[in-house]
Design a protein with these regions (language model features):
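Non-catalytic cap/lid and distal C-terminal segments of serine-dependent acyl enzymes
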Residues: 1-246
Length: 246
């Protein structure tokens, strides 16, 4: 398997940002880490090994990004607006710096996939919904898609609202976005077992919104034995990859 340990300077975040590449060909899969995780986490917890057959066949190549969650949504000493503004800086890094860097490394200029587990699933779905011109496939595993989970009630703060998928999706009526959502491949999965309860309300609210807006998506509920844990994500990711058009 082709592996590269990479880094580049981010002007938006004013620091060196680290990322790893796994694979030599195929659609680019941008991976967001779980809560406070690093660019090494996806490999360390066996997700790359779980998807090895897809990588070695040249069907996908993974790029695992660094996180700034500890300075944004997990920075509980900040007020909600400042948490959201740090996330916005990270968004600018991803879209304006990381994605061009990855494209330059690979020569891939078609639509990308994004994925993540737990908080990474929140990022994956949020980035897809905000940038469906960049990401045309998403696999979100065990996420919480409501910004209130991180900041509490936020009233009319637009910076938070614009990063709370269960809220802004209801008011997304722009045909440019809706058309791209309808053309995309979307998987949102949750288990019903231990530690999955936090994500269930937003999972069902999202499903309702997608249904009402006639956006095709696979909202997959796995069983009551399926916990919020890497053991299950290692099973889910290759399963869903096997059902997407790669």
């Amino acid at each position: 398997m082709h592996i590269e340990n990479l880094s580049h300077w981010s002007g938006h975040l004013n620091r060196e940002m680290y990322l790893n590449r796994y694979g030599h060909a195929g659609i680019l899969v941008v991976v967001f880490a779980s809560s406070g995780g690093s660019h090494n986490e996806y490999y360390d917890f066996g997700m790359i090994d779980a998807c090895a057959s897809f990588i070695e066949e040249g069907r996908v190549q993974f790029f695992t990004l660094s996180s700034v969650d500890s300075e944004s949504w997990l920075a509980t000493w900040k007020n909600g607006h400042d948490q959201a503004e740090m996330h916005r800086a990270y968004e600018r890094y991803v879209i304006e710096e990381a994605i061009p860097f990855i494209k330059h490394k690979t020569g891939w200029f078609d639509g990308m996939m994004t994925t993540g587990c737990s908080m990474g699933a929140y990022h994956a779905l949020n980035f897809f919904l905000q940038h469906p011109d960049v990401f045309t496939k998403v696999i979100a595993l065990s996420g919480v898609y409501d910004a209130r989970f991180f900041v509490g009630d936020y009233y009319n703060d637009d910076a938070i609202y614009q990063n709370s998928p269960v809220d802004y999706i209801w008011n997304q009526n722009d045909g440019w976005f809706i058309d791209r959502y309808r053309q995309a491949e979307i998987v949102v999965c949750t288990g019903l077992g231990a530690w999955e309860q936090d994500g269930l309300p937003s999972f069902y609210k999202l499903k309702e919104a997608f249904d009402q807006k006639q956006i095709p998506a696979w909202f997959a509920e796995w069983g009551h034995d399926v916990a919020h844990d890497w053991e299950w994500w290692r099973k889910q990711m290759p399963y869903f990859l096997g059902h997407l058009y790669l």
